[in-house]
């Protein structure tokens, strides 16, 4: 595990590296329930493909990937990233996965999102961070972190024999700075 880079009362974020590989991490990526709201659910992840991803992730200049660890015991419970960073437009997409099911609904995701949004605006000088999701719990988590609804991509996701809308949300730096105390 890399040293802690960002932390809150609940979680710490560290750069995601090959040392983060574990059987439990691999199992998350292949767990149908964990990936219910992910496109990756249709493609099996092998040990080799995960290790390759972890080796190569630091070579990408348009994304930053972090492991999410519970602060109390530093157990790796998920990952969070800013990806598709457009440096000129100063915007990025946010991605998050809480793979440890025992950590669901306990505020870890909300806390990790708060940390990475603050990092994106204060350290990377971004102006906009956006997401697309059709996970109702994720929508609530993003709303808690000042994300605003911007639109819907109708019937974009096909899962379990039905189409689902993809909710588009974003937070702007100006809105973030109005509500936080630095």
Segments (PLM) and residue ranges:
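A short, well-structured alpha-helix characteristic of acyl/acetyltransferase catalytic modules
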Residues: 1-51, 175-182
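Acetyl-CoA-dependent GNAT
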Residues: 45-102, 172
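Short hydrophobic/aromatic beta-strand or adjacent loop that forms the aromatic wall/cage
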Residues: 63, 164-168
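Conserved G/P- and acidic residue-centered "switch" motifs that form tight phosphate/ATP-binding loops
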Residues: 74, 107, 161
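Conserved acetyl-CoA-binding loop-helix of GNAT-fold acetyltransferases
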Residues: 105-119, 139-144
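Conserved GNAT acetyl-CoA-binding A-motif
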Residues: 122-133
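Conserved catalytic-core motifs of GNAT/GCN5-like acyltransferases
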Residues: 130-132, 148-164
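Conserved active-site tyrosine of GNAT-family acetyltransferases
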Residues: 142-147, 169
